[in-house]
Amino acid sequence: MKDNIRYSVIVNLIKTLVLTLLSFISFPHVCAALGAEVMGTYTWANTFVFYFLIIAKSGIPNIAIRECSKVKDDKMALSKKVQEFFIIQAIHTILAFTLMCIGVFSVKELFEWKDLIFILSINFLISTFSFEWLFIALEKHYFISLRSIATLATCSLLIISLVRRPTDLYLYSFLAILSTILNVIINVFCLRKYVTFKYVGPYEFKSYLKPIFVVFIISLMLTLYNSTDTFILGFLDKSKSQVANYSVGVKSIEIIIALITSLDAVFIPRATRYFKMDNKYFFNNLTRYGFNICLFIAIPAIASMSMLSHQITNIISGGSQEYQEAPIILIILVTMSLTFSLSDMIYEQVLLPMKKEKYYLYTLLLGAVLNIGGSIYLGNIFKEYNNNPAIGVAIATMLTDIIVLINLIVVAKEYVIKALFNKNTLKLVVGGICVLITSFLIAYVIPIKNDIVKIILTVCVGAVVYIVSLALLKEDLVYSFIRKKNK
């Protein structure tokens, strides 16, 4: 079991790392080419569209993965479920687009940017035909990885080649969603291999309505919880430059979160299968393994990014002087690499397979209220104090994330406490402290002027120090890898 999971984990991590590298190549170029105000406008409009993407999806992918993974070996049963979920998602997409149009034509500031918003909305309109959840349920991680890398590499090359100035905003917006369009075309072409398009009925929608509704509300609350900070900031800062600073500051954190949460695609089908089989031994082992990977990645990332905040944001922004507040925002939000990722894993790997989504919903309701209220309150305070509302919004988001994680640990304590609080976690913390000290010495003691060289040196030396310290401590992941190599 573990070897198969390890392969899937490695494939997903490689995919996410490559996609991250491609983002790092194109994003600084875009920041420098568009400028803070135009980039802030894009981020603000994209955040608005993202709300309706969530309505269009309505939590359907998560439920579809769970249900399709149960019948993955029966082509007709699988085809029936695929057709059912496609119809449900198509209806929700039409509803989402209608609501978005009402919003755009009702709010003056949104109407002024209607062309940009409608270009970005293509992303969720065409996503209806992606069937990505099917390939995840079938555990086609190698196919997903190759396809994603190829399409994003193509789009990144086009962005770097064609986006040159602030007037290229609409061109960039289209190129940013082009990878989704290409992914959909490839998925539809490959779909017939796994399912039939012939009618397989009668359809049974009723059994999905309650779980989809719960997961939809969860997705909506998660969006409010995650994206409202940017949206509120857009109203607090009319120039949108603070939104751009916030976007640059949070970019590297989002990369770490994406790296960890990409593993959901590996763990959800397996966790669902083990729980359905009532195999608590494998279920608990999978939970602990998932948490170990999360901590293994997040702890050293927090340590190194805290020490290299100026260098990281300078590279992400393309060296522009318009992003002066980005480093402090990164430092404030850096713990989200761990807190958000753990919260996501508790939901996806524990609560969702157990069909206890409602507990996550209650926690997110609390988080959304705290984040909205805190962002407005602290954002206005920092706006009046030093005209930096982004810092106030970042503090509110960071505190809310910690509260949400604590609540989820309490809710799922039967499966989470032992998997999270153990000797192995302590070993990872010790390794993280070693990385923190190493990063501090390289960042502030060794005289290196080039930001890229400093980051590469910190990552390389820090990685060696981290792995060696964990090997000496006999940390589970590192020690099991060493033993496997020595066999």
Label every PLM stretch briefly:
Residues 1-2, 145, 169-176, 185-227, ...:
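Interhelical loop/hinge segments that connect adjacent transmembrane helices in multipass membrane
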Residues 1-23, 76, 202-218, 288, ...:
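N-terminal membrane topogenesis motif
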Residues 3-62, 97, 101, 152, ...:
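Signature of the first transmembrane helix
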Residues 31-39, 109-111, 138-142, 146-184, ...:
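Membrane-interface helix-loop junctions in multi-pass transport and translocation proteins
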Residues 57-73, 253-291, 344-352:
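Helix-loop junctions and terminal segments of transmembrane helices
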Residues 104-120, 240, 305-338, 342, ...:
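Interfacial segments at transmembrane-helix termini and the short loops linking adjacent helices
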Residues 125-148, 335-366, 414:
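Membrane-interface junctions at transmembrane-helix termini in multi-pass inner-membrane proteins
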Residues 238, 419-424, 439-487:
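Membrane-proximal transmembrane or re-entrant/amphipathic helices at the cytosolic face
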